[in-house]
Regions:
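Short, well-ordered alpha-helices that flank and scaffold nucleotide-derived cofactor binding pockets
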Residues: 17, 21, 88-92, 115, ...
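NAD(P)+-binding Rossmann beta1-loop-alpha1 motif at the extreme N-terminus of oxidoreductases
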Residues: 1-52
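Short alpha-helical
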Residues: 34, 81-82, 107-108, 155, ...
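NAD(P)-dependent Rossmann-like dehydrogenase/reductase catalytic/cofactor-binding core
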Residues: 158, 168-169, 219-311
Length: 311
């Protein structure tokens, strides 16, 4: 199986490296030329959970016109706001039989992919793996967690089960799912309680479980998201709050993806996470003051480091 990782940042590089130990042929694609060239020259170094460093030789690409043609699978892990741009770049090298699997954060990604590739070509899922990009060619595995794969709508198909087996062959915990839409909302609720808080404060995920003030803020944001998710047909109980805190603890060494974006002064996925809760809340008449505040603060922070204007 030929697999193209579209969006080989911290998480994409981690999953690509793990999959490279299977029967599959893996290609990493990212516009981060420095990271791609470092891996091409010396392989990808992963600082493992036990502190050891393992090296993975991998094929890398930073130019779309150099990509290998006719991949069997495109694993989409770009930022939500870059989904359509990335698909327009890779779609030209794909065949009618290419399958696209999104494990991205946020809501609406599989629909965006389907607009370009067709709904029948898309699988979706959720992963709790955590990874931090430490520098070109170097990542830290920040936490283990399951990956769920299935059809965007309906029960898990045979093709989804085949990909689950591939992930298991790579020693990644994976399960087929008949409820992908619910899992995507569940991941959204988890991200709501972790990403913006870590991005705004500079802390690692684990501090959310250790600092009472951070825990309380996480709880308030998640409680709003639970109510909004229920209005969309995905009811979660109050135990979801403790689940989010447990995820923060399990990925304690990790900086969330949003935290890493802030560290690098890059655009974040705030609109697809806390901002999505705010939008859906307004549609349903549900107040979301904590998520509104987190969203606004993140936008102010982004504007500070992305704007070319001076006060």
């Amino acid at each position: 199986m030929n697999v193209l990782i579209a969006g080989a940042g911290a998480l994409g590089s981690l999953i690509g490296a793990r999959l490279s130990k299977t029967r599959a042929s893996i290609s990493l694609f990212s516009t981060n030329r420095e990271h791609m060239e470092a891996i091409r020259r010396g392989g990808l170094d992963i600082e493992e959970l036990d502190g050891t460093v393992r090296n993975y030789p991998l094929k890398t690409f930073f130019e779309a016109d150099k990509l290998p043609r006719n991949p069997d699978l495109v694993l989409v892990l770009v930022k939500t706001y870059a989904t359509q741009t990335a698909l327009s770049l890779v779609h030209g090298v794909c065949s009618a039989s290419t399958v696209f699997l999104t494990l991205q954060n946020g809501i609406g990604n599989w629909e965006r992919i389907a607009e370009i590739a067709g709904k029948e070509a898309v699988l979706a899922g959720s992963t709790a793996q955590g990874s931090t990009l430490l520098g070109p060619g170097l990542i830290r595995h920040g936490g283990n967690g399951p990956t769920y794969i299935g059809e965007p709508e309906g029960p898990a198909s045979e093709r989804a089960r085949r990909l689950v087996e591939l992930f298991r062959e790579a020693e990644l915990v994976a399960e087929p799912s008949d409820e992908v839409a619910r899992l995507i909302w569940e991941k959204l609720v988890i991200n709501v309680g972790i990403n913006a808080i870590t991005g705004l404060t500079g802390i690692r995920n684990g501090f959310i479980a250790e600092m009472p003030e951070a825990t309380d803020l996480c709880r308030s944001a998640v409680e709003e998201a639970i109510i909004v998710a229920g209005s969309k047909g995905f009811p979660f109980g109050v135990e979801m709050v403790q689940r989010v805190i447990s995820v923060a603890r399990a990925t304690g060494r990790n900086r969330s993806s949003m935290g890493q974006d802030v560290d690098k002064k890059k655009k974040t996925e705030i609109d697809a996470i806390n901002g999505a809760v705010v939008r859906f809340g307004k549609e349903a008449g549900i107040p979301t003051p904590v998520n509104e505040t987190l969203t606004s603060l993140m936008k102010v922070l982004e504007a500070q480091y992305t704007s070319q204007r001076t006060p």
